[in-house]
Amino acid sequence: MKNLQASVRDRLLNIAQETNRPFSEILQYYGIERFLYRFGCSKYADKFVLKGALMFTVWQVSERRTTLDIDFLANYNNQVATIEKVIKQICKVPVTPDGLTFDAETVKGQKIKEEMEYEGVRVKFIGLLGRSRIPMQIDVGFGDVVYPRPKIIDYPVILDFPKPHLKGYSPESIVSEKFEAMVKLGLLNSRMKDFYDIWLMMRQFNFNGLHLVEALKRTFKRRKTTLPEDRPFFAEEIYDEKSDRQTLWRAFLRKGDIKIAPERLSDTARKIEEFLMEPLDAIKSNYEFHKVWKKSGVWSTPPGVSL
Protein backbone atom coordinates (compact mmCIF):
# COMPACT_ATOMS: atom_id res chain seq x y z
CA MET A 1 0.00 0.00 0.00
CA LYS A 2 2.84 2.40 0.86
CA ASN A 3 4.49 1.79 -2.51
CA LEU A 4 1.18 2.49 -4.26
CA GLN A 5 0.65 5.68 -2.26
CA ALA A 6 4.15 6.89 -3.11
CA SER A 7 3.63 6.06 -6.79
CA VAL A 8 0.30 7.90 -6.91
CA ARG A 9 1.78 10.90 -5.12
CA ASP A 10 4.71 11.06 -7.56
CA ARG A 11 2.38 10.90 -10.56
CA LEU A 12 0.15 13.62 -9.14
CA LEU A 13 3.21 15.80 -8.52
CA ASN A 14 4.23 15.32 -12.15
CA ILE A 15 0.76 16.38 -13.31
CA ALA A 16 0.92 19.48 -11.10
CA GLN A 17 4.26 20.43 -12.62
CA GLU A 18 3.16 19.72 -16.19
CA THR A 19 -0.06 21.74 -15.85
CA ASN A 20 1.46 24.47 -13.67
CA ARG A 21 -1.23 23.95 -11.03
CA PRO A 22 -0.78 23.70 -7.24
CA PHE A 23 -0.21 20.15 -6.01
CA SER A 24 -2.95 20.68 -3.40
CA GLU A 25 -5.46 21.33 -6.19
CA ILE A 26 -4.46 18.20 -8.15
CA LEU A 27 -4.60 16.15 -4.94
CA GLN A 28 -8.06 17.54 -4.20
CA TYR A 29 -9.33 16.60 -7.65
CA TYR A 30 -7.91 13.12 -7.25
CA GLY A 31 -9.71 12.78 -3.92
CA ILE A 32 -12.98 13.94 -5.50
CA GLU A 33 -12.56 11.56 -8.43
CA ARG A 34 -11.87 8.50 -6.29
CA PHE A 35 -14.68 9.28 -3.87
CA LEU A 36 -17.09 9.58 -6.82
CA TYR A 37 -15.85 6.18 -7.98
CA ARG A 38 -16.78 4.68 -4.62
CA PHE A 39 -20.15 6.42 -4.81
CA GLY A 40 -20.80 4.90 -8.23
CA CYS A 41 -19.96 1.44 -6.87
CA SER A 42 -22.35 1.80 -3.94
CA LYS A 43 -26.02 0.94 -3.53
CA TYR A 44 -26.77 4.68 -3.37
CA ALA A 45 -25.65 5.50 -6.92
CA ASP A 46 -29.22 5.53 -8.25
CA LYS A 47 -30.43 7.96 -5.57
CA PHE A 48 -27.92 10.78 -6.11
CA VAL A 49 -27.25 12.98 -9.16
CA LEU A 50 -24.00 14.86 -9.63
CA LYS A 51 -24.49 18.58 -10.28
CA GLY A 52 -22.63 21.86 -10.00
CA ALA A 53 -19.22 22.80 -11.36
CA LEU A 54 -17.94 19.21 -11.47
CA MET A 55 -20.26 18.64 -14.42
CA PHE A 56 -18.05 21.06 -16.36
CA THR A 57 -15.25 18.54 -15.87
CA VAL A 58 -17.50 15.78 -17.20
CA TRP A 59 -18.29 17.88 -20.28
CA GLN A 60 -14.62 18.85 -20.70
CA VAL A 61 -15.54 22.54 -20.78
CA SER A 62 -12.48 24.69 -21.37
CA GLU A 63 -11.92 27.63 -19.01
CA ARG A 64 -14.02 25.98 -16.32
CA ARG A 65 -13.55 27.45 -12.87
CA THR A 66 -11.84 25.57 -10.07
CA THR A 67 -14.11 23.85 -7.57
CA LEU A 68 -13.04 21.90 -4.52
CA ASP A 69 -16.29 20.30 -3.39
CA ILE A 70 -18.97 17.90 -4.63
CA ASP A 71 -22.62 18.83 -5.24
CA PHE A 72 -25.42 16.27 -5.39
CA LEU A 73 -29.18 16.29 -5.80
CA ALA A 74 -30.61 13.44 -3.75
CA ASN A 75 -33.85 11.54 -3.95
CA TYR A 76 -33.42 10.50 -0.36
CA ASN A 77 -34.18 11.32 3.26
CA ASN A 78 -32.82 14.79 4.04
CA GLN A 79 -31.98 14.23 7.70
CA VAL A 80 -28.38 15.03 8.58
CA ALA A 81 -27.85 11.72 10.40
CA THR A 82 -29.14 9.77 7.40
CA ILE A 83 -26.80 11.49 4.94
CA GLU A 84 -23.89 11.08 7.37
CA LYS A 85 -24.61 7.34 7.41
CA VAL A 86 -24.62 7.23 3.60
CA ILE A 87 -21.25 8.99 3.36
CA LYS A 88 -19.73 6.78 6.06
CA GLN A 89 -20.78 3.67 4.17
CA ILE A 90 -19.38 5.01 0.91
CA CYS A 91 -16.05 5.71 2.63
CA LYS A 92 -15.87 1.97 3.33
CA VAL A 93 -16.87 0.68 -0.13
CA PRO A 94 -14.24 -1.88 -1.23
CA VAL A 95 -12.54 -0.84 -4.49
CA THR A 96 -9.44 -1.57 -6.52
CA PRO A 97 -6.62 0.00 -4.47
CA ASP A 98 -5.93 3.57 -5.60
CA GLY A 99 -3.77 4.76 -2.71
CA LEU A 100 -6.60 6.60 -0.98
CA THR A 101 -8.56 5.98 2.16
CA PHE A 102 -11.50 8.02 3.44
CA ASP A 103 -11.84 8.26 7.21
CA ALA A 104 -15.46 7.47 8.08
CA GLU A 105 -14.81 8.54 11.67
CA THR A 106 -14.30 12.15 10.53
CA VAL A 107 -17.67 12.41 8.75
CA LYS A 108 -19.65 15.36 10.12
CA GLY A 109 -22.83 16.85 8.64
CA GLN A 110 -24.83 20.03 9.14
CA LYS A 111 -27.94 21.60 7.64
CA ILE A 112 -27.59 24.26 4.96
CA LYS A 113 -30.18 26.45 3.30
CA GLU A 114 -29.35 28.31 0.14
CA GLU A 115 -31.79 28.88 -2.73
CA MET A 116 -33.62 25.60 -2.22
CA GLU A 117 -37.05 25.24 -0.65
CA TYR A 118 -35.82 22.24 1.29
CA GLU A 119 -32.88 22.29 3.67
CA GLY A 120 -29.75 20.73 2.28
CA VAL A 121 -26.99 18.88 4.08
CA ARG A 122 -23.27 19.66 4.03
CA VAL A 123 -20.91 16.86 4.96
CA LYS A 124 -17.20 17.24 5.67
CA PHE A 125 -14.64 14.48 6.19
CA ILE A 126 -11.00 13.63 5.50
CA GLY A 127 -9.35 11.64 2.74
CA LEU A 128 -5.80 10.37 3.08
CA LEU A 129 -3.04 9.66 0.59
CA GLY A 130 -0.35 8.41 2.94
CA ARG A 131 0.25 11.34 5.28
CA SER A 132 -1.37 13.87 2.96
CA ARG A 133 -4.78 14.95 4.20
CA ILE A 134 -7.51 15.85 1.72
CA PRO A 135 -10.38 17.94 3.18
CA MET A 136 -13.56 16.71 1.50
CA GLN A 137 -16.89 18.57 1.32
CA ILE A 138 -20.18 17.37 -0.14
CA ASP A 139 -23.30 19.53 -0.45
CA VAL A 140 -26.51 17.56 -0.90
CA GLY A 141 -29.69 19.25 -2.12
CA PHE A 142 -33.23 17.92 -2.19
CA GLY A 143 -36.52 18.56 -3.93
CA ASP A 144 -35.41 19.85 -7.33
CA VAL A 145 -36.43 18.36 -10.67
CA VAL A 146 -33.96 17.66 -13.50
CA TYR A 147 -35.02 18.10 -17.13
CA PRO A 148 -34.10 16.42 -19.40
CA ARG A 149 -33.73 13.43 -17.09
CA PRO A 150 -30.29 12.66 -15.63
CA LYS A 151 -28.01 10.49 -17.73
CA ILE A 152 -25.32 8.05 -16.68
CA ILE A 153 -21.91 9.70 -17.01
CA ASP A 154 -18.31 8.55 -16.96
CA TYR A 155 -16.32 10.99 -14.85
CA PRO A 156 -12.86 11.73 -16.30
CA VAL A 157 -9.89 10.35 -14.37
CA ILE A 158 -6.49 11.89 -13.71
CA LEU A 159 -4.60 8.59 -13.49
CA ASP A 160 -5.24 5.17 -15.00
CA PHE A 161 -7.77 3.95 -12.45
CA PRO A 162 -11.40 2.96 -13.19
CA LYS A 163 -13.71 5.85 -14.08
CA PRO A 164 -16.56 6.85 -11.76
CA HIS A 165 -19.90 5.82 -13.26
CA LEU A 166 -22.92 7.71 -11.89
CA LYS A 167 -25.87 9.96 -12.75
CA GLY A 168 -25.27 13.53 -13.90
CA TYR A 169 -27.30 16.73 -14.35
CA SER A 170 -28.47 18.09 -17.69
CA PRO A 171 -27.01 21.41 -18.95
CA GLU A 172 -30.56 22.81 -19.21
CA SER A 173 -31.29 22.26 -15.52
CA ILE A 174 -27.95 23.71 -14.45
CA VAL A 175 -28.73 26.89 -16.39
CA SER A 176 -32.29 26.98 -15.01
CA GLU A 177 -31.28 26.55 -11.37
CA LYS A 178 -28.51 29.12 -11.55
CA PHE A 179 -30.78 31.62 -13.29
CA GLU A 180 -33.54 31.05 -10.73
CA ALA A 181 -31.09 31.69 -7.88
CA MET A 182 -29.89 34.90 -9.55
CA VAL A 183 -33.47 36.15 -9.98
CA LYS A 184 -34.61 35.17 -6.50
CA LEU A 185 -31.64 36.65 -4.65
CA GLY A 186 -31.98 40.02 -6.39
CA LEU A 187 -30.12 42.69 -4.43
CA LEU A 188 -28.59 40.03 -2.19
CA ASN A 189 -26.94 38.27 -5.10
CA SER A 190 -23.21 37.89 -4.54
CA ARG A 191 -22.91 34.58 -6.43
CA MET A 192 -20.63 35.69 -9.23
CA LYS A 193 -20.00 32.05 -10.15
CA ASP A 194 -23.58 31.75 -11.44
CA PHE A 195 -23.12 34.62 -13.88
CA TYR A 196 -19.86 33.13 -15.07
CA ASP A 197 -21.20 29.58 -15.39
CA ILE A 198 -24.21 30.56 -17.51
CA TRP A 199 -22.07 32.86 -19.66
CA LEU A 200 -19.59 30.01 -20.15
CA MET A 201 -22.26 27.41 -20.94
CA MET A 202 -23.92 29.55 -23.61
CA ARG A 203 -20.52 29.72 -25.34
CA GLN A 204 -19.83 25.99 -25.04
CA PHE A 205 -23.17 24.29 -25.74
CA ASN A 206 -25.88 24.17 -28.34
CA PHE A 207 -29.26 24.21 -26.57
CA ASN A 208 -32.56 22.74 -27.71
CA GLY A 209 -35.11 25.52 -27.15
CA LEU A 210 -37.94 23.17 -26.18
CA HIS A 211 -35.77 21.48 -23.55
CA LEU A 212 -34.49 24.75 -22.08
CA VAL A 213 -38.01 26.22 -21.88
CA GLU A 214 -39.28 23.11 -20.09
CA ALA A 215 -36.35 23.13 -17.65
CA LEU A 216 -36.95 26.80 -16.83
CA LYS A 217 -40.67 26.25 -16.28
CA ARG A 218 -40.15 23.25 -14.01
CA THR A 219 -37.38 24.81 -11.95
CA PHE A 220 -39.18 28.11 -11.32
CA LYS A 221 -42.45 26.31 -10.56
CA ARG A 222 -40.77 23.87 -8.17
CA ARG A 223 -38.99 26.68 -6.35
CA LYS A 224 -42.06 28.94 -6.38
CA THR A 225 -40.25 31.81 -8.09
CA THR A 226 -41.84 34.12 -10.66
CA LEU A 227 -40.19 34.07 -14.07
CA PRO A 228 -39.00 37.52 -15.22
CA GLU A 229 -40.95 38.75 -18.23
CA ASP A 230 -38.94 41.80 -19.28
CA ARG A 231 -35.45 43.17 -19.17
CA PRO A 232 -33.57 43.89 -17.03
CA PHE A 233 -33.66 40.44 -15.43
CA PHE A 234 -31.46 41.37 -12.50
CA ALA A 235 -31.19 44.02 -9.80
CA GLU A 236 -30.04 47.44 -11.00
CA GLU A 237 -26.77 47.12 -9.05
CA ILE A 238 -25.73 44.35 -11.45
CA TYR A 239 -25.65 46.91 -14.27
CA ASP A 240 -24.06 49.72 -12.25
CA GLU A 241 -20.33 49.78 -12.94
CA LYS A 242 -19.72 51.66 -9.69
CA SER A 243 -21.57 49.19 -7.46
CA ASP A 244 -19.97 46.69 -5.12
CA ARG A 245 -21.20 43.90 -7.41
CA GLN A 246 -18.70 45.05 -10.04
CA THR A 247 -15.99 44.86 -7.38
CA LEU A 248 -17.11 41.34 -6.49
CA TRP A 249 -17.03 40.36 -10.17
CA ARG A 250 -13.48 41.58 -10.66
CA ALA A 251 -12.36 39.83 -7.48
CA PHE A 252 -14.00 36.60 -8.68
CA LEU A 253 -12.19 36.77 -12.03
CA ARG A 254 -8.88 37.59 -10.36
CA LYS A 255 -9.14 34.81 -7.75
CA GLY A 256 -10.04 32.22 -10.38
CA ASP A 257 -7.41 33.50 -12.82
CA ILE A 258 -10.22 33.82 -15.39
CA LYS A 259 -9.13 35.81 -18.41
CA ILE A 260 -11.79 35.12 -21.07
CA ALA A 261 -14.86 36.59 -19.35
CA PRO A 262 -16.07 40.18 -19.86
CA GLU A 263 -14.36 42.62 -17.51
CA ARG A 264 -17.71 44.20 -16.63
CA LEU A 265 -20.47 42.31 -14.86
CA SER A 266 -23.04 44.42 -16.71
CA ASP A 267 -21.78 43.06 -20.05
CA THR A 268 -22.04 39.51 -18.73
CA ALA A 269 -25.60 40.12 -17.52
CA ARG A 270 -26.66 41.54 -20.90
CA LYS A 271 -25.19 38.53 -22.71
CA ILE A 272 -27.24 36.25 -20.46
CA GLU A 273 -30.32 38.32 -21.27
CA GLU A 274 -29.68 37.80 -24.99
CA PHE A 275 -29.50 34.06 -24.36
CA LEU A 276 -32.63 33.73 -22.22
CA MET A 277 -34.95 36.46 -23.57
CA GLU A 278 -36.47 34.39 -26.38
CA PRO A 279 -37.13 31.28 -24.23
CA LEU A 280 -38.76 33.50 -21.59
CA ASP A 281 -40.88 35.20 -24.27
CA ALA A 282 -42.03 31.76 -25.39
CA ILE A 283 -43.08 30.89 -21.84
CA LYS A 284 -44.85 34.23 -21.40
CA SER A 285 -46.73 33.88 -24.71
CA ASN A 286 -47.30 30.13 -24.28
CA TYR A 287 -45.94 29.01 -27.63
CA GLU A 288 -43.63 26.12 -28.51
CA PHE A 289 -40.07 27.32 -28.86
CA HIS A 290 -38.48 25.22 -31.59
CA LYS A 291 -35.33 27.26 -32.07
CA VAL A 292 -31.83 26.01 -31.30
CA TRP A 293 -29.16 28.05 -29.54
CA LYS A 294 -25.85 27.90 -31.32
CA LYS A 295 -22.79 28.37 -29.16
CA SER A 296 -21.72 30.99 -31.68
CA GLY A 297 -24.30 33.21 -29.95
CA VAL A 298 -27.65 33.12 -31.76
CA TRP A 299 -31.02 31.39 -31.65
CA SER A 300 -31.82 29.89 -35.05
CA THR A 301 -34.64 27.87 -36.59
CA PRO A 302 -33.62 24.33 -37.62
CA PRO A 303 -34.18 23.38 -41.28
CA GLY A 304 -37.68 22.06 -41.94
CA VAL A 305 -39.26 23.80 -38.93
CA SER A 306 -41.84 26.50 -39.60
CA LEU A 307 -42.72 28.93 -36.83
Question: Whereabouts are the PLM-identified features?
Answer:
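Glycine-rich beta-strand-to-loop/alpha-helix junction loops that act as flexible
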Residues: 50-54
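Structured mid-to-C-terminal alpha-helical surface segments
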Residues: 1-48, 58-66, 70, 74-307
